[in-house]
């Protein structure tokens, strides 16, 4: 599955008339929280994301971040690879499907997921399926653009996880873009965070710089 999809994506990018863009971001997080669970033991983390997107809707990308897990002194880096297709149905509706592989240094095992995301206006629903364990994760979010206008970004997120030992969670995220072409973004997220097996309320912040270049 992985080799077939990556081969298809790479073949798309070798088309002579191919046009698209390179985009991504680099950022600093006061806590790296993923699906309601800290991946850095509540400590700061630096991340990078880069993506090549074709005008046809196909894309490939990578995500890298610092991680730290309780009882594991060997794992410090996460590097993910993903590929997919984003179908723009209309100005307000899109369907994104793809594959992602999560890899770590140290002793943490890599794993793979398939995902599908539906965006309708401010609503977004995404479902991930673990290829090896058949576990599923779903996330529903809504952006309150009509309420806050261009003053700042306001987003409500609810995650549902059927992985044993994992809880559902809810987060409220407030963000603001600034600087030249609004390339910088600062956000604060309030919600639940699982740390060493205990769930508690948490607040964490992120500062990112976004970039893009067409070709």
What is the predicted function of each stretch?
Residues 1-4:
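Positively charged n-region of N-terminal signal peptides that target proteins for export
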Residues 7-16:
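Bacterial N-terminal signal peptides
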Residues 16-215:
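Outer-membrane beta-barrel proteins
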